[in-house]
Amino acid sequence: MQRQYNESHRSVMVQETLHYLRPTYNGVYVDGTLGEGGHTKAIIEATSGKCKVIGLDIDEEVLAIAEQNLKEFKENVELFNVSYVDFDLVLESLAVDKVDGFLLDIGVSTYQLKAKGRGFSYEIDEPLDMRMSLSGSVTAADVVNSYPEKELARIIFEYGEEKRYARRIARKIVERRPIQTTIQLVEAIKAALPPQERFRRKRHYATRTFQAIRIEVNGELKGLRTALEKFPNYLKPGGRIVIISFHSLEDRTVKHFFREQDGVTLKILTRKPVVPSVEEVSENPRARSAKLRAAERI
């Protein structure tokens, strides 16, 4: 079932991705977060249709959109409804030992934020869900309504980087249970924060808590680390890893892994994260927090 959705997704940092991924004729690439297919399309076009992209996405609804968007490139793509964490199983099923590059564009897609019924957005009143895979067993409502207050506070503190108010937010959530919708959760967060704190923040006051719960529901940081550890084993010498992240926890995970492997299995190509141009941010405000890091197999 494809939900009501009227806004197209704009892939972030496409030119920077091509620069660091360096797609070549006859290359084989894994786009582990296919989304609506924008980066994959750019990779294929950069090689004049002379490469292959294995596209993965855990979200079956988004994958269906990508399949439509990439139908003119069906000879160049193979699409799979799996998490990028399991890319190795896909490669084995295709009898592919090594690839020329891995790309991850981590974060919530425009579709997930805007399509009705997904429960990712604090702007739309709908049931709390936040599962990137609809076959996932744990929803945001499960986390919000069943986790002990202390565990909720830890998640909001660590994953949401809500340093000062994590305990207050967790306490208010527990007081207001059951919380079944996104707006009910927003109201609990609002009640936990002093008015001056809400007005002081540049981003919506619910952003950090929503991020924390989404990361917990989908096991995002653990999955990222697991995939990173496997990537070098499936990269040809000179093959590249390009990761685009949207919050500091993801970026820190990538940075630390690259540093651990620098000179061992990888050579870091970006000593500092690459950020979007001023022009891109003005045209696509969602790009403002994106950071790109890249490394090459040695």
Curated annotation (Swiss-Prot):
Sites where the protein binds S-adenosyl-L-methionine: 37-39, 57, 91, 105, 112
GO biological process entries: rRNA base methylation
InterPro entries, A to Z: RsmH (IPR002903), SAM-dep_MeTrfase_MraW_recog (IPR023397), SAM-dependent_MTases_sf (IPR029063)
GO MF annotation, one: rRNA (cytosine-N4-)-methyltransferase activity
Class of the enzyme per the UniProt entry, highest EC level: transferase
Keywords: Cytoplasm, Methyltransferase, rRNA processing, S-adenosyl-L-methionine, Transferase
GO cellular component, one term: cytoplasm
Entry annotated with the keyword Oxidoreductase: no
Keyword Transferase recorded: yes
Catalysis: reaction(s): cytidine(1402) in 16S rRNA + S-adenosyl-L-methionine = N(4)-methylcytidine(1402) in 16S rRNA + S-adenosyl-L-homocysteine + H(+)
Intracellular or extracellular location(s): Cytoplasm
Task performed by this protein: Specifically methylates the N4 position of cytidine in position 1402 (C1402) of 16S rRNA.
Family membership: Belongs to the methyltransferase superfamily. RsmH family.
Entry protein name: Ribosomal RNA small subunit methyltransferase H
Annotated source species: Kosmotoga olearia (strain ATCC BAA-1733 / DSM 21960 / TBF 19.5.1)
